[in-house]
Amino acid sequence: MFRTRVADEQIWSAIEHICFYLLLPALIVRTLSRANLTSVPVLDFMLVLVSAIAGMSFLLILMHRLLRSRYPDSGPTFSSLFQGATRFHGFVALAIIGPLYGDHGITLTALALAIMVPVLNIANVIVLTIYGSNNSVANGRQILFRIITNPLIIACVVGLTLNWTGMPDIIFNTIDIVGNGGLGLTLLAVGAGLRLDQIAEDKLLVTVGVLIRLIGMPLMVIAIASLIGLEGLPRTVAIIAGAVPTAASAY
């Protein structure tokens, strides 16, 4: 649809913003507010995701030495590789898991967002501060601001709060109507945002980043989940969260 210009780029940008700031948060709030969280192994789920991020971050830092031989000014290059290999696209994760596993899958995906987004924001800003250019440096206040203003994180907090306090049916039904349009429009927005003809100049670096993100990260999750003993749908959701493409912010 984007290629045929049925709608121009500004409309697709508006759709993406509506999904990110309204539809997907509504979907998360609706799901978490009525979810049975007692059946979710939260600690094991969190341990798998955080350990996978930490393990991949450590391996990437070791790879920085290999980059020095090819890239004299390897700091900014490494920070770009690190972002592309560790960040994940929450839109795509929700769009895949929702239709496959229903509300329970969305609940686990929302928890994955609540766990991974703060950890990844902190890790990536630290790497940018150490390895990136001076223009990339961000202080602790900026990191905190990015986390607490993320609509998906806010939705997780609101949904978990309503799960504890309860929510009137009329409000739930309204949020349900809004959230139901989220997944379909999200898939359209993700597809319209693909720019296969604008691959970065350094194809080797792009290839390495893609392989780490799409193959290395899910393998890391599988290995850690096996060690910890995470099974069933939580394991599946963790693997999918590790296997989806990098977030748009990584670009």
Predicted regions and their residues:
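Alpha-helical transmembrane segments of multi-pass small-molecule/ion transporters
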Residues: M1-Y251
